[in-house]
Design a protein with these regions (language model features):
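Conserved SAM-binding loop
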Residues: 277-278
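Core catalytic lobe of class I
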Residues: 2-12, 16-267, 272-274
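Positively charged, low-complexity nucleic-acid-binding target-recognition regions
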Residues: 1-23, 281-312
């Protein structure tokens, strides 16, 4: 009887969770992001992650990555203006790109009176042996915001270096420099969750053996680990967070959002990428549902074992 009651309770709980999920806004929409964003109300998004075409002649099924540079910049200005309109006052807008082109976009953002923090995604696992010049090992990410943004630093802390761990608890004398006279002594403190996040994010790209089970047929797919970090840093813990993804592409941001249990709206002009993302989303849902059911079964078995031992 006790087992049956537990099963009934779980069924009710699953039904409530299903109804809650149906009320959530989780959509991947086929269409041009600029036109679709024009249909949305102001100040709706907590987080916006933009991974646009870099104008490097990649094939995304249209000509969006093959424009004259002035035309490309004007196009960027259009979708960025819409993103800023949709962003909440304390929200975060991330824009991926190569530094050489983001520098021009940064100037536009300055003219719009938008605050910007320049982040660097450093990947050290990609190499080009045939290259005859400096090899690229990073991309930049512009973190744009209107007012002081939500920032969950403790959720994205990083691993300490071995040297810092060994020095934990020791006293260090502040060195003389531009901002210090070197007269203050401090301790090497170690936080249980790791070091404070830095503006250089060291996460491998999906190249070689790294992320081979994650990769899909998309030239500029971002790793889930990176997408998750950006979302965790900016998600609103007090109420539902809405993520807007103007360029869905491979769908990595969408998958990360689903795993973080936040709402999302994504736009994608290429129907093949919409199908790809929906397929990844269904696979992710299946894995999570299967794991949840296994956890519930383990929980019931554990409770029954405790009850049995108590009766004895």
């Amino acid at each position: 009887m006790q087992v049956q009651d537990q099963m009934n309770h779980l069924n009710i709980k699953e039904q409530e969770e299903q109804e809650e999920q149906e009320d959530r806004r989780r959509e991947v929409i086929l269409g041009d992001c600029i036109e679709k964003m024009k249909e949305m109300p102001d100040n709706i998004a907590d987080i916006i992650i933009c991974d646009p075409p870099y104008n490097f002649n990649k094939d995304f099924g249209n000509k969006s990555d093959k424009q004259a540079f002035p035309v490309y910049l004007e196009w960027c200005n259009e979708w960025i203006s819409q993103c800023i309109r949709l962003l909440k006052d304390h929200g975060s807008l991330y824009i991926y790109g190569f530094s050489e082109k983001l520098a021009f976009i940064r100037v536009k953002l300055y003219e719009m009176n938008i605050n910007v923090k320049w982040l660097v995604w450093h990947y050290c696992n990609r190499t080009s042996p045939s290259s005859k010049f400096w090899q690229k090992s990073h991309e930049s990410i512009l973190l744009c915001y209107k007012k002081s943004p939500v920032f969950n630093k403790d959720d994205i802390r990083e691993e300490y270096t071995e040297g810092y761990k060994k020095a934990a608890g020791r006293t260090r004398k502040e060195t003389k420099g531009r901002f210090s006279k070197g007269e203050v002594k401090t301790l090497y403190n170690v936080h249980e969750n790791g070091a404070l996040p830095r503006d250089v994010i060291k996460i491998p790209c999906l190249s070689g053996s790294y992320g081979k089970n994650e990769r899909v047929d998309h030239e500029t797919q971002k790793p889930l680990e990176l997408c998750t970090k950006l979302i965790k840093a900016a998600k609103n813990k007090e109420k539902n967070t809405l993520l807007l993804v103007p360029f869905v592409g491979s769908g990595s941001e969408i998958i990360a959002a689903y795993k973080e249990n936040i709402d999302f709206i994504g736009f994608e002009i290429n129907p093949e990428f919409v199908d790809m993302t929906n397929k990844r989303l269904e696979d992710t849902k299946s894995i999570i549902d299967k794991n949840d059911k296994n956890d519930n079964c383990v929980s019931i078995a554990s409770e029954n074992k405790k009850s049995h031992n108590k009766d004895i």
